[in-house]
UniProtKB/Swiss-Prot annotation:
One family name in Pfam for this protein: DEAD
Similarity comment text for this entry: Belongs to the DEAD box helicase family. DDX31/DBP7 subfamily.
Segments forming domain Helicase ATP-binding: 171-372
One GO MF term: RNA binding
Compositional bias ranges of the Basic and acidic residues kind: 111-127, 696-709
Biased composition (Basic residues): 35-45
Gene Ontology terms describing biological process: endonucleolytic cleavage in ITS1 upstream of 5.8S rRNA from tricistronic rRNA transcript (SSU-rRNA, 5.8S rRNA, LSU-rRNA)
Subcellular location: Nucleus, Nucleolus
Name of the molecule in the record: ATP-dependent RNA helicase dbp7
Length: 758
């Protein structure tokens, strides 16, 4: 068919041209949907006056009554009709999540219970309940200890008189050989209460002159066998018991003690067991492992078994291990060739509380046990009480305890203000402990309180002499100057401790905190709340409440020990947490009359330089500036931002683990997650806070510390060699680390070698 040359031209209006639709990619489906709606709205363009008249309208209802409106008619815009353009350029990033900076002092919930705020200076000093006895007749010699041991306590350890629980337990355990349950309040000297009779019994077996061999040496020495085992729930408590025991045995050098705990090398522990031990301090898990796998551990002569902190042993799940240990000790027991050794084993259970778990542990290990306590005259009263009151804890009478109801947004600045005021004057407080709920929170707050100030960064380059006066920092990153609440006249050193650190780092950090003679603060989890006798601890702050009342008892028990004065402060949030005050009052003999309340605003005023009585609001400005500075510091450093998010998530998980009896007071549904996120220097919405990967475990943390130590030692690598771990992050993002590891391995495998001739 021939072309006729016909051309057709169609005229279309500009409004009828169909624009190509751009397909949005990336982001969540909600973000794509909102961006699509915005693009569709902009594509319509601005409406004109003619458009409104040209649109067809529905027929008017004849039954409708027209009422004249008093509102004047709108005037037409005369600015060129660029309202649509202005609207389109107002929020160029409207599809991205915006950060909302909330104010510290607005929309905070008010405390539900209004109580009178008492000043600590107006509280009458109570008589110490765990101090040594003043009566001169109650000396260690009168209790049955040998003169050499009593003289060693007086001259070397500077112990002149026993405490009430030591008096009751030493006399009972030296007279009879039956099982015993020792119950006393924290800080009353329970460790010496069972160690002194133990050492006295073993010294009596090896008394020179009465029982000696042909060479005149005592019969009992390190090769004579193992006579006593002391079990403790934590490694730190085992270390402390071992130190106290070694100090006692300096007057009997022929008796040898040792430890086997988790985290140490089994090879070195087996070597110590082969050399011979008379007293062994151990954790249940490691002792059960040695009983199964170490032939050098002979327990046929064990006649004393001590279970320290029995309630904690059961809480940590050591019930099966303890059952296995008791059965193996019974099965392997043999008559001893050494004269004077008892025929049966004596078991001693120690605990500050008498709970159902402790009673169950007593059923496993004790037989016809004697209940030893500091106040034997109160036994009839306690027998009449209910089981709940029997399990109630006791707080030392000289401990001054207070609580502060602090809103969630103000927690971080209030804690900082409190320690600014505490360490404002040199010598007022020497050592303090901050207890938090999880290890991630410990790491985050340690970085916040030890971060370098902007002024310090500029001074370091010019003033090199001032750096010599700063407290030494730890190569492991667990010790650093506390720049947040230090001042030139009173520098403060901050220590951190939690269970995810390697054992050698935990031991060195705890030892450095105990030996430090300057102002220092330890921020830790409950790993340091049981049995540790840290010297000169004047203040305990529970930033996160304990998971049970018994844990609270052991936390505040780190201060006010053996008759010393001490203070404790707990942070509570407005709302259901205020009911926890009744639990705190039950721990006092007088019903909680000595328990005081601290006002959160007064803490902020004192800490940030304001006067409590004046109406000046400068302290609010200073507190807000400090909070915003911390938030900017976290935003500028991705590492610290991820640390803050991880700490926030771990804190929420830990908050949900309170015991059932107290869960109504710590209801996770009552938490304002947005306000709580601000206490972790976060500006994100709680729903947007997501941290990939898992927290480093003990093994990964141990590898990181080992790698840092090797790099510090300056080990040289072989020429031409490469390390696979160079391109791998420190396991913060597990998926990325695994992906990079596979890529690195593929590079090594695919490279040319002697088998790849091509």
């Amino acid at each position: 068919m021939a072309d006729d040359g016909l051309l057709l031209n169609f005229s279309l209006g500009d409004n009828n041209i169909i624009q190509p639709e751009t397909k949005l990619k990336g982001g969540t489906w909600r973000d794509r949907l909102s961006a699509k709606k915005i693009a569709k709205h902009h594509a319509k363009g601005p409406r004109t006056a003619g458009d409104e008249d040209s649109t067809p309208r529905a027929p008017r209802n004849p039954n409708r009554i027209e009422v004249p409106s008093s509102r004047p008619t709108k005037r037409q815009r005369t600015d060129g009709g660029d309202s649509g353009k202005q609207q389109s350029h107002t929020h160029p990033h409207s599809n991205q999540p915006r950060q909302f900076i909330s104010s510290l002092f607005t929309k905070n919930p008010e405390p539900q219970k209004v109580e009178e705020v008492k000043e600590e200076g107006h509280v009458e000093d109570a008589k110490p309940t765990n101090a040594p006895l003043i009566d001169g007749l109650d000396t260690f010699t009168n209790l049955g200890l040998s003169p050499s041991l009593a003289a060693h306590l007086l001259t070397k350890l500077e112990l002149k008189a026993p405490t009430a629980i030591q008096k009751a337990s030493i006399s009972q355990l030296l007279k009879e050989e039956g099982d015993a349950f020792i119950q006393a309040e924290t800080g009353s000297g329970k460790t010496l209460a069972y160690l002194l009779p133990l050492v006295q019994r073993i010294m009596a077996l090896s008394k020179p002159g009465a029982q000696t061999d042909a060479k005149g040496q005592p019969i009992v020495h390190r090769d004579s066998g193992l006579f006593a085992i002391v079990l403790a729930p934590t490694r730190e408590l085992c270390k402390q018991i071992s130190v106290v025991l070694e100090n006692l045995l300096r007057c009997a050098h022929w008796i040898v003690a040792g430890t086997v705990i988790g985290g140490e090398k089994k090879k070195s522990e087996k070597a110590r067991l082969r050399k011979g031990l008379n007293i062994l301090v151990a954790t249940p898990g490691r002792l059960a492992d040695h009983l199964d796998n170490t032939q050098a551990l002979d327990v046929s002569n064990v006649r004393w078994l001590v279970l320290d902190e029995g309630d904690r042993l059961m809480e940590l799940g050591f019930e099966e291990e303890i059952q296995g240990i008791v059965k193996k000790l019974d099965a392997r027991q043999r008559p001893s060739r050494i004269p004077g050794v008892p025929t049966r084993r004596t078991t001693i259970l120690c605990s500050a509380t008498l709970k159902m778990s402790v009673q169950k542990l007593g059923e496993i290990s004790l037989k016809d046990a004697v209940h030893i306590k500091a106040d034997p005259e109160d036994e009839d009263e306690k027998a009449r009480r209910s089981k709940e009151e029997e399990s109630a804890y006791r707080v030392p009478a000289q401990l001054k305890q207070s609580y502060a109801v602090v809103a969630a947004k103000l927690r971080l600045v209030t804690l900082t203000a409190f320690f600014k005021r505490t360490f404002m004057r040199k010598g007022s407080v020497m050592k303090a402990i901050i207890f938090v709920s999880c290890a991630d929170s410990v790491d985050f707050h340690f970085e916040v309180f030890t971060r370098k100030q902007a002024k310090e960064d500029g001074d370091e380059s010019s003033d090199t002499d001032k750096s010599e006066d700063k407290p030494p920092s730890s190569p492991h990153g667990t010790i650093a100057p506390a720049t947040a609440f230090s001042n030139p006249s009173n520098p403060v050193t901050l220590f951190r401790l939690h269970g995810s650190l390697p054992q050698n780092v935990r031991t060195s950090t705890l030892g450095a905190f105990a030996k430090n003679k300057e102002a220092s603060v330890l921020i830790c989890t409950d790993v340091a709340s049981r049995g540790l006798d840290l010297p000169n601890v004047d203040l305990v702050v529970e930033y996160d409440p304990a998971f049970s009342a018994e844990d609270h008892l052991h936390r505040i028990g780190r201060t006010a020990r053996v008759g010393r004065d001490g203070r404790a402060l707990i942070f509570l949030q407005p709302g259901c947490e205020e009911n926890y005050v009744e639990v705190l009052k039950r721990g006092y003999r007088d019903g909680g009359k000595a328990l005081t309340r601290a006002d959160a605003n007064d803490i902020l005023k004192r800490g940030f330089g304001g006067n409590v009585e004046s109406g000046n609001k400068d302290w609010e400005t200073k507190a807000t500036d400090w909070q915003c500075e911390i938030e900017r510091w976290a935003l500028e450093n991705p590492e610290y931002l991820e640390m803050a998010r991880r700490a926030f998530q771990s804190h929420i998980r830990a908050y949900a683990t309170h015991i059932a009896a107290e869960r109504s007071m710590f209801n996770i549904k009552e938490l304002h997650l947005g306000h709580l996120a601000k206490a972790f220097a976060l500006r994100d919405r709680p729903s947007k806070i997501n941290v990939p990967g898992l927290r480093q475990g003990k093994e990964e943390t141990k590898k990181d510390f080992k790698a840092e130590r090797n790099s510090a030692a300056g080990k040289k690598r072989k020429a031409g060699g490469t390390d696979l771990a160079d391109d791998i992050p420190s396991a913060n993002n597990t998926a990325t680390a695994a992906q990079k590891m596979r890529a690195k391995m593929k590079e090594h495998i695919s490279g040319a070698n002697e088998f790849n001739l091509a």
